[in-house]
């Protein structure tokens, strides 16, 4: 390949530059990057690539001196006026090629939505990709003109965020909001009230844009509805048009040793991979107190800055996630299933004593789940039985469970 490129005076384009340091021998010193160094130095091979500043530092660390053989050109993100002009050029292109036209307000709204929610990519590339997707779907649906509702609809499909949380002209119906959670969460009305407040803050755009949407800690024994609440939040916030529930659950008892941290936040870690694939989702860290303290230290960056960079310099953006941690601290000894009263016990004091202040202080909302009384237990049982009764295998046989 090197000799063919030299003979034809061709240029090799590499999309993933860091892989040069990871491909080849057992270590970076035996990698493809090291092998190609002499060809680059002698002018036999010309390479063009792209990378983030973080990836550039990774390459300098893995293969010292390699990137110094390249001319490094810094490319800044386009400003708003320039990006909007690019949108207009793209609109002219789609109008000319497939007869699809975006209104000016639709183009401007695309910029606003992408600027607020898709900060892990840059303009104009992220906008062109989004507008291209909108145009393709409109073409298949035999639509020729796209306006504000269309752009919101397509963005909602991609992110799972309901349109009324994206549109300034639509208000949240407080009654239907509470009804949604009351149908899914039993016996925890104070929790529902707090969740509704978080949703209203998000709707108003008042949440900190440089942190996760919210960081919550649910305390209480097993069986009081902590996981069910996390599922309900993910369904409401990010569940529109999604095939799979936008939630990842990590059992933190699986991360009790220092070396296991990379299984969570390393380049192949479960959490990092999930957030890259589904940046709009709920992250449920179950029984957080069972994780190794190094996990808490690593999570500080996520809770404080809303971002995490893995060992290969790749960014995982948590600013569109809701992080929910559950804890049984103080509740296990008193009630194994949450059916007995623990009234008067200071769960928050247990949590505060367990975590370092810098970790505890980054939790936005601390919620203690009530024990379940007989009426609530009956309501939950009937709800679960009703869901089972509505399954095809039961309905087709005409069976009744109660």
Task: Report each predicted region and the residues it spans.
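AAA+ P-loop NTPase nucleotide-binding core of proteostasis motors
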Residues: 1-402
């Amino acid at each position: 390949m090197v000799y063919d490129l030299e003979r034809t005076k061709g240029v090799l384009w590499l999309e993933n530059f860091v892989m040069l340091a990871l491909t080849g021998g057992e270590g970076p010193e035996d990698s493809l990057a090291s092998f190609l160094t002499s060809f680059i130095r002698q002018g036999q091979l010309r390479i063009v690539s792209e990378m983030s500043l973080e990836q550039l530092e990774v390459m300098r660390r893995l293969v010292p001196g390699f990137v110094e053989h390249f001319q490094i050109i810094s490319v800044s993100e386009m400003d708003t006026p320039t990006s909007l002009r690019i949108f207009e050029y793209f609109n002219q292109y789609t109008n000319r090629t497939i007869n699809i036209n975006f209104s000016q307000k639709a183009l401007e709204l695309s910029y606003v939505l992408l600027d607020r929610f898709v900060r892990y990519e840059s303009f104009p590339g992220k906008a062109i990709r989004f507008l291209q997707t909108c145009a393709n779907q409109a073409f298949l649906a035999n639509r020729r003109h796209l306006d504000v509702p269309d752009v919101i609809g397509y963005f909602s499909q991609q992110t799972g965020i309901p349109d009324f949380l994206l549109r300034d002209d639509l208000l949240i119906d407080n009654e239907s909001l509470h009804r949604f959670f009351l149908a899914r969460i039993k016996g925890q009305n104070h929790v529902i009230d707090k969740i509704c407040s978080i949703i209203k803050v998000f709707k108003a755009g008042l949440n900190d844009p440089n942190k996760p949407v919210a960081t919550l800690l649910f305390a209480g024994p097993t069986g009081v509805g902590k996981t069910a609440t996390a599922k309900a939040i993910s369904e409401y916030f990010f569940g529109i048009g999604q095939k799979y529930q936008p939630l990842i659950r990590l059992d933190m008892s699986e991360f009790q040793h220092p070396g296991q941290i990379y299984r969570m936040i390393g380049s192949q870690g479960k959490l990092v991979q999930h957030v890259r694939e589904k940046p709009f989702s709920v992250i449920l860290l179950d029984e957080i107190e069972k994780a190794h303290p190094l996990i808490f230290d690593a999570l500080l960056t996520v809770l404080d800055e809303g971002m995490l960079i893995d060992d290969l310099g790749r960014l995982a953006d948590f600013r569109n996630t809701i992080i929910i941690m559950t804890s049984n601290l103080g509740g296990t000894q008193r009630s194994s299933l949450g059916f007995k009263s623990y009234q008067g016990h200071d769960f928050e004091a247990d949590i505060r004593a367990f975590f370092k202040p810098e970790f505890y202080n980054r939790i936005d909302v601390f919620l203690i789940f009530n024990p379940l009384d007989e009426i609530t237990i009956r309501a939950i049982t009937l709800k679960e039985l009703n869901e089972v009764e509505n399954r095809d295998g039961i309905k087709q046989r005409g069976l009744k469970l109660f």
